């Protein structure tokens, strides 16, 4: 009997790149492979795959249980191809793995790889220069916090780099994680330093990078009146907080498929795309009340101001920005932009800024003690970026069943009588996405949370009655299980959004968050 394929890949049909980049967690059966063995990723149609295989979890006998596979392959025939892991048929020649090219000084950290170089200041908040194919870009963070955090001293408290190597024996790292931990120290000794973490995840030779950021308020809460509510004295009140990148000789462009403006012209005046609400039917939902029990949104319409033309439109923005220097370009695409309002994209000649938070006047964002907020965007740079497309991976449910990594998981579950009821979570009138709209489960704190509408059974009246699940792990596990069984990316999206909300908002112990992706989720998440 032939062993089933481990996973398959799919790319968007509208993209024109010839190569596919992928990152996927893959399970392995107990006793099959050990860390000492060199594993390669193979396509069943024989086409070339360049991939790094990194151990992530082990069975009790120390055999590999989960590995992270990150790599690149041609898009030719990809839709029909299957992927497996195996030992190479021929023992590859000895090759010394090269450490990333790093230079450190008391005030700088420089990381060079392929045609890019990050030169990072240690005494400023994620600030420095990015050099791509010889072209220089400057980047940094803009912030406007209210007292006692209005005057902060930033310092790079810790950083580390994790390289991954492919099976080609070139010796070069093909994938790098660079993580930077900052402390933002207030002049008020009664408050603990805020924490800001940046992780750059990039394919070194392919011009693609993900920028992940997390802002944490680690201070203990007062719990006035024995409650955990808004308005705590140690809350961080944010008026503006964002990351910018610029080039003195560059030109900037903004684009958005949902907004009406002329995007072909380069930016030559102050321009802005500002998402102030979800612009949904229930944008004024009680979930958006502030500590004074007042609505934190005064005007729901999105602001579109480009090259002097300004309008307010009821749209859900999904912007992208381009910064061009000659033939070298940099493209910035935020993830889940409108869902995490209030947020904005601004630009001027030669500069683009993504405002993680941009609050309305007199409605600052309140990051409570114990809360954090994470954001992510994609960066595409260098002449290679347009040649590659990010692929979506699907694990083969037969292989997951064979590996026995998830208790009671079986492809036979799709024929269970309960499956038709479970499917209503996607297709029913009260599916999970419809519930989001009903309560307007959007905004930076709410997005990903689940509306517990079953608790409204005895509610009288027409007004919305917000309530949320407190056993978040059950639906998180369920969403992932349904994704594995069906391959439906909607289940995976629900799991990703919920897990991010749990990590950022719901879990806090001893002043620090516990990353509770659950071992299963850690392995799924690329």
Language model segments and positions:
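Surface-exposed beta-strand/loop patches in extracellular or lumenal glycoproteins
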Residues: 11-37, 226-248
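Solvent-exposed beta-strand/loop surfaces of large extracellular or lumenal domains
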Residues: 36, 41-67, 347-356
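Beta-strand/loop-rich accessory regions of lumenal/periplasmic or secreted enzymes
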Residues: 108-402, 437, 442, 446-454, ...
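Well-ordered alpha-helical segments within folded domains of soluble proteins
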Residues: 466-484, 526
């Amino acid at each position: 009997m032939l062993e089933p394929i481990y996973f398959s890949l799919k790319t968007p049909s509208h993209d024109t790149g010839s190569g596919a980049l992928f990152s996927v967690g893959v399970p392995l059966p107990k006793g099959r492979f050990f860390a000492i063995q060199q594993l390669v990723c193979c396509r069943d149609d024989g086409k070339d795959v360049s991939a790094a295989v990194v151990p992530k979890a082990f069975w009790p006998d120390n055999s590999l249980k989960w590995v992270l596979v990150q790599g690149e392959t041609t898009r030719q025939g990809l839709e029909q191809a299957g992927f497996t892991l195996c030992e190479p048929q021929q023992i590859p020649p000895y090759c010394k793995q090269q450490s990333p090219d790093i230079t450190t000084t008391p005030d700088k950290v420089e990381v060079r790889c392929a045609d890019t170089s990050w030169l990072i200041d240690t005494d400023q908040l994620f600030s420095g220069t990015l050099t791509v194919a010889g072209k220089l870009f400057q980047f940094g963070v803009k912030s406007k916090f209210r007292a006692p955090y209005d005057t902060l001293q930033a310092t790079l408290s810790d950083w580390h780099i994790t390289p991954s190597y492919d099976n080609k024996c070139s010796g070069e790292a093909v994938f790098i994680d660079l993580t930077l931990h900052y402390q933002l120290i207030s002049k008020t000794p009664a408050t603990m330093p805020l924490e800001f973490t940046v992780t750059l995840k990039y394919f070194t030779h392919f011009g693609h990078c993900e920028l992940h950021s997390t802002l944490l308020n680690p201070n203990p809460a007062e719990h006035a009146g024995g409650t955990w509510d808004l308005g705590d004295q140690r809350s961080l009140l944010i008026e503006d907080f964002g990351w910018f990148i610029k080039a003195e000789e560059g030109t900037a462009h903004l684009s958005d498929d949902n907004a009406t403006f002329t995007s072909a012209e380069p930016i030559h005046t102050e321009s802005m795309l500002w998402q102030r609400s979800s612009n949904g039917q229930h944008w004024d939902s009680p979930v958006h009340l502030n500590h004074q029990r007042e609505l934190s949104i005064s005007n729901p319409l999105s602001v579109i101001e480009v090259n002097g033309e300004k309008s307010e439109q009821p749209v859900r923005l999904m912007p992208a920005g381009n910064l061009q220097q000659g033939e070298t370009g940099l493209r910035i695409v935020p993830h889940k932009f409108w869902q995490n309002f209030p947020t904005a994209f601004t630009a001027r000649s030669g500069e683009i800024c993504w405002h993680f938070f941009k609050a309305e006047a007199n409605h600052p964002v309140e990051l409570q003690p114990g809360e954090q907020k994470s954001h992510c965007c994609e960066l595409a740079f260098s002449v290679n970026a347009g040649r590659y497309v990010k692929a979506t991976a699907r694990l083969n449910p037969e292989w997951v069943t064979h590996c026995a990594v998830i208790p009671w998981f079986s492809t036979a579950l799709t024929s269970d009588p309960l499956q038709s009821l479970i499917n209503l979570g996607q297709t029913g009138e009260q599916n999970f996405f419809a519930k989001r709209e009903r309560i307007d489960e959007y905004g930076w704190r709410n997005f990903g949370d689940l509306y517990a509408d079953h608790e409204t059974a005895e509610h009288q009246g027409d007004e919305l009655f917000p309530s949320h699940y407190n056993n978040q792990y059950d639906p998180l596990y369920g969403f992932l299980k349904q994704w594995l069984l069906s391959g439906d990316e909607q289940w995976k999206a629900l799991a990703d959004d919920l897990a991010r909300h749990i990590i950022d908002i719901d879990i806090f112990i001893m002043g620090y968050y516990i990353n509770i992706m659950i071992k299963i989720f850690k392995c799924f998440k690329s």
